[in-house]
Amino acid sequence: MAKVKIGINGFGRIGRLVARVALVRDDVELVAVNDPFITVDYMAYMFKYDTVHGQYKHHELKVKDEKTLLFGDKPVAVFGLRNPEEIPWAETGAEYVVESTGVFTEKEKAAAHLKGGAKKVIISAPSKDAPMFVVGVNEKTYTPDIDVVSNASCTTNCLAPLAKVIHDRFGIVEGLMTTVHSITATQKTVDGPSSKDWRGGRAASFNIIPSSTGAAKAVGKVLPDLNGKLTGMAFRVPTVDVSVVDLTVTLAKEASYDEIKAAIKEESEGKLKGILGYTEEDVVSSDFVGDSRSSIFDAKAGIALSKKFVKIVAWYDNEWGYSSRVVDLIRHMAAAK
């Protein structure tokens, strides 16, 4: 199958990391980037140097001119347009556009990219109305007539594969999720105004901040069997990357914690290899920086109260793992018949 040509709108955390993932893979080709708020030389700087993931070393990166970045010998077109419908994706051959501004998360707004020649749009965030797909869980329900999709959230990508295994094997009656989540760009370095979420405006590096998340409820969209059975919340904590899901569930069938571990291990080595991981090591969050899997079950961190009530813990690099799934979803869509 030919390389799938990708464009990226919005060169923030996820946009830049999707670009990093795409540039080291041989099944996709990055051809264009659009961001109205940064110049091409600043784009190159932000791409090359990354506090969390380190300096980019796979290609020599140069600015050819105001509209072109060179990754080694590979040119990537650069645009600086605010309106999605004005971006000339067709000129660059970009068929799949990653919408990672965080602004155009609704189906109709994201669909504006189609006017510029994009064939499909992948929103790198949850969406109110675009169909959501989580690779390893429900991507097989995608059909080629769908032009705008959402890759859900990083937390839903961690939780859904885990919930699927538990539900398929033992049945989930109901459950609560907490994600202990690293800082993201929407937070404040010092206390500042945040009228919609007062707590969210407090200093990110000095506080544990309770926050809402739709990640658990969204699992019900990708796994309809679990609709209405899961909900959850988040604590934002002062780490810059890697988060951890704590899923506490009531099971339909009795199971020992060892049986649950065995089921997850089996799936992590089988159908969900590369998506779901399994570890019995004494790991901490920084051990997962740069881990491309969606969800890594921590066998030593979980605990069971009884054969029907259990807490399951899974790590995820909320930046790199998620960005890897964006590219996987594009490949799946391109291959779908």
Curated annotation (Swiss-Prot):
Catalytic activity: D-glyceraldehyde 3-phosphate + phosphate + NAD(+) = (2R)-3-phospho-glyceroyl phosphate + NADH + H(+)
Pathway: Carbohydrate degradation; glycolysis; pyruvate from D-glyceraldehyde 3-phosphate: step 1/5
PROSITE patterns: GAPDH
Enzyme Commission identifier(s): 1.2.1.12
Entry keywords, A to Z: Cytoplasm, Glycolysis, NAD, Oxidoreductase
Protein name listed in UniProt: Glyceraldehyde-3-phosphate dehydrogenase, cytosolic
Binding site for D-glyceraldehyde 3-phosphate: S153, C154, T155, T184, T213, G214, R236
SMART domains from the UniProt entry: Gp_dh_N (SM00846)
